[in-house]
């Protein structure tokens, strides 16, 4: 079985060093091919020599999204049985350190919160999650695994045709038979671009049991601290969802989730806004919690709307 882990980044090396360390483990200890693509020559030149010895590090200033180098090269794409596209968004996790092959104990400089030792070798953790994800795909389900960022497994016969309107999540749901069902379900909410909201599809599929989702850090920490923009199910299991996902899932499944304190608040959905996911994420500092109408949610976990609006954690 041949596997390629592909990453694209627009962040300086120091911001993604932790991820580079994980990728080096995958390459050195598991023999997995790793391809890291930089969009900036300045950042590309910052990468220490030892990482080039373990993985393929490319420079493509014209690339616009993760996987451009793969989807534009059918020879590379069809060479592997599985391609794992990993997001490089590690900026808020940069204080998590890797010590002697283990996730160590540190204090987040921005929040002052402790992170706790997990006492599990990182390499073993990565191997287990990747193997489990591939098994999920082989069983006909779509695997969505988070590892200090987002790592998702794609079917090898998927052809990326339009990065603005097609997502691997949607494609996988189509393959699993949930895509049409999800679209029909979401249309009742009158969203301007149903096809652009793969966060909806992911949450919907997860609730149906089709998506495997787990943040390694959240799943293994002995205490539920340090991850501000996430939600937790009433039964205590974690759902790795972004701030944007939280609003979607909250609206779709009242009572299924309870809020944790949000780092940047909530995103307001405005009719006619046609920038899709990226546009909403760019606006999330403006469209914060106070702008979103939470009163319509009938959620037993919300005891006081004003506390939610002020950013307090409501148990």
Q: Which residues does each PLM region occupy?
A:
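Hydrophobic targeting segments
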Residues: 2-7, 23, 33-36
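Short, well-formed alpha-helical segments that are part of the catalytic scaffolds
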Residues: 7-27
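C-terminal catalytic/acceptor-binding lobe
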Residues: 15, 19, 193-315
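Active-site-proximal specificity loops/subdomain of glycosyltransferases
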Residues: 38-80, 93-102
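Short, high-confidence coil segments that cap the C-terminus of an alpha-helix
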Residues: 80, 139-143, 210
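Short aromatic/hydrophobic "clamp" motif used to bind/position activated sugar donors
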Residues: 83
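Acidic metal-phosphate-binding loop of nucleotide-sugar-dependent transferases
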Residues: 88-92
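Conserved catalytic core of nucleotide-sugar-dependent glycosyltransferases
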Residues: 93-194
């Amino acid at each position: 079985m041949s596997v390629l882990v592909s990453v694209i980044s627009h962040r300086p090396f120091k911001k993604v060093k932790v991820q580079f360390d994980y990728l080096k483990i995958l390459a050195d200890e598991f023999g997995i091919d790793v391809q890291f693509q930089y969009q900036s020559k300045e950042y590309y030149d910052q990468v220490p020599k030892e990482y080039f010895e373990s993985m393929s590090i490319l420079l493509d200033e014209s690339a616009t999204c993760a996987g451009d180098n793969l989807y534009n090269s059918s020879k590379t794409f069809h060479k592997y049985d599985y391609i794992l596209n990993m997001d490089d968004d590690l900026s808020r996790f940069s204080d998590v350190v890797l010590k002697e092959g283990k996730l160590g104990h540190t204090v987040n400089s921005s929040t002052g919160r402790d992170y706790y030792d997990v006492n599990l070798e990182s390499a073993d953790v990565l191997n287990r999650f990747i193997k489990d994800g591939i098994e999920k795909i082989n069983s006909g389900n779509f695997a969505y695994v988070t590892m200090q960022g987002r790592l998702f497994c794609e079917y090898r016969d998927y052809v990326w045709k339009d990065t603005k309107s097609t997502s691997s999540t949607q494609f996988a749901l189509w393959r699993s038979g949930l895509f049409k069902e999800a679209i029909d379900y979401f249309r009742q909410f009158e969203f301007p671009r149903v096809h652009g909201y793969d966060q909806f599809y992911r949450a919907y599929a997860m609730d149906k049991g089709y998506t495997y989702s787990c943040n390694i850090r959240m799943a293994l920490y002995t205490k539920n601290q340090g991850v501000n923009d996430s939600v937790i199910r009433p039964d205590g299991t974690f759902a790795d969802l972004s701030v944007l996902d939280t609003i979607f899932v909250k609206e779709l499944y009242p009572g299924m989730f309870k809020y944790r304190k949000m780092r940047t608040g909530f995103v307001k959905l405005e009719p006619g806004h046609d920038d899709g996911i990226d546009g909403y994420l760019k606006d999330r500092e403006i469209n914060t919690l106070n702008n979103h109408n939470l009163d319509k949610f009938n959620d037993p976990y919300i005891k006081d709307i004003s506390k939610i609006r002020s950013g307090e954690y409501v148990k």
